[in-house]
Amino acid sequence: MKLGIIFAGQGSQKVGMGTDLYEIYPEFRNSFDLLTDEHRRIAFEGTAEEIKATVNAQPILLAFGIGVSKILAKKGIRADYTCGLSLGEYTALTSAGVFSEEEAMAVIQFRANAMAKASEGLDTVMSAVLGLERNLLLSLCKKANEKAKVDIANYNCPGQIVISGTKDGVTELERLAEEAGAKRTMRLSVSGPFHTSYMEPASKALAEKFKEVAFGEMEIPVIFNCIGRERENERIQDLLTAQVCSSVYFDDSIKYMRDKGVTKIIEVGPGKALSGFVKKTCRDIDVISIETAEDIRKVEKWLEK
């Protein structure tokens, strides 16, 4: 049996996340204590609007994911392959030994600020389109771009693709998609046009930041968002720089894991969004998610099967 561990991205954040894990597991508490007092307050008892903000959601989710990965590691649960959705890629890289916790937190805070700055003054949104095939939506995207800017941000799973861009561009593509037979469209709880060309200023800022970052040896194979596979000759920093303004090939990443022999996947949440993507992409993979302390106990029993 080969095990994959995957980490959730922005949009999965929720007020109250990590409360019980913080109380029970010292290794989780150590990770969450790397957050500022204000970030911990927002995570535990803030408002939905506060935790949605990029500069809050990203470090909180990173600390949550790293904390859970340390709980699993202490219990001897180790991935054969790992990946994460957008922000979650940094959590995966940290769990694989590429970044220290402190380095990852510094990079993510920088990334969040750069992405928020790139979003300033833009009237942009993200939306999930359900029930359309990849090539059809790509052609509709080109048509919508005749009126306003919109890009494909995430290929989550067959039948669910996320679009991102100006409010006018996304609205136009939603209209075209529904006319073409999409089951429905759904606006997402994020605060910027992520994984589009609007993020090029953030990408350039990250390229400069990475010049001062120490990259450790990768102890677990990581599947990267912007290529949907392990790296070959590509540098990690180049893949992360490209990631912020490129499409995320999450469905291809899960297929890659399956082709490498992965039969079980643990999603580190909060939430179960990625588990849903896995089930729709590779039905033969068994998947379970972690959000609470009770979920940790469920995972231990699940792995014994």
Residues covered by each model-derived region:
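Alpha/beta catalytic cores of group-transfer enzymes, especially the acyltransferase/condensing modules
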Residues: 10-12, 37-40, 96-246
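Non-catalytic positions within long, well-ordered alpha-helices that form the structural scaffold/packing
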Residues: 73, 178, 258-261
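FabD-like malonyl-/acyl-CoA
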Residues: 1-136, 142, 188, 264-294
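A short, flexible low-complexity segment enriched in Lys/Arg and Gly/Pro that occurs
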Residues: 60-65, 243-250
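A short, acidic, amphipathic alpha-helical segment used as a generic capping/interface helix at domain edges
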Residues: 245-262
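Short, charged, surface-exposed secondary-structure boundary motifs
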Residues: 296-302
